């Protein structure tokens, strides 16, 4: 399989802005994953709600932890969790280590949705692998992880959030 393919608009230019390319890739993956939600009855969920469910399913289980991970205020994340709870996708339970905190847990419906989101993400990744090849995607993943997890030289003064409409 070819390690480089031309897109419908032509080959990627070496000088193409990396930030724009990353945002476009992220948006495409999010759109692809969210497209699976409508037929399953969850077309009303926002990208932030879907990502929150994925985080909870992967063990991030307090509003404070979720807010830090998502780059939101605890108040905003609390509202997102309230909507997910009202939709029957998560429960708030007493936290065993902190009486002031609540532990978030997926309901049976929340676990089903988590599994659907995880499968849709895996399908999107397979499509990317088919496009560029497994070795290229592995290299891209390693490069992104190295950059994402490296210390920032200076903390930004404001948080940056991408919005996918």
Q: Where do the protein language model's features map onto the residues?
A:
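C-terminal regulatory/oligomerization modules of transcriptional regulators
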Residues: 1-13, 135-165
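N-terminal helix-turn-helix DNA-binding core of bacterial DNA-binding proteins
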Residues: 32-73, 156-158
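Generic structural concept
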Residues: 23-26, 57-60, 107, 141-144, ...
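Alpha-helical linker/hinge and terminal dimerization helices associated
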Residues: 22-25, 29-36, 70, 113-131, ...
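N-terminal positioning helix adjacent to the helix-turn-helix/winged-helix DNA-binding module
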Residues: 18, 29, 48-49, 109, ...
């Amino acid at each position: 399989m070819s390690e480089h393919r031309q897109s419908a608009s032509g080959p990627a230019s070496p000088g193409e802005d990396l930030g724009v390319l990353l945002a476009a890739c992220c948006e495409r993956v999010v759109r692809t994953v969210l497209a699976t939600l409508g037929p399953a009855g969850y077309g009303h969920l926002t990208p932030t709600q879907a990502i929150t469910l994925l985080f909870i399913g992967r063990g991030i289980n307090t509003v404070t932890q979720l807010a830090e991970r998502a780059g939101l205020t605890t108040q905003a994340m609390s509202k997102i969790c309230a909507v997910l709870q009202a939709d029957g996708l998560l429960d708030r339970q007493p936290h065993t280590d902190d009486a002031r905190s609540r532990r978030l847990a997926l309901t049976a419906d929340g676990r089903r949705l988590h599994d659907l989101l995880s499968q849709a993400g895996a399908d999107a990744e397979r499509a990317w692998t088919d496009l560029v090849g497994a070795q290229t995607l592995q290299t891209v993943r390693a490069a992104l992880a190295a950059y994402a997890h490296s210390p920032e030289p200076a903390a930004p003064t404001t948080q940056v959030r991408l919005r996918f409409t």
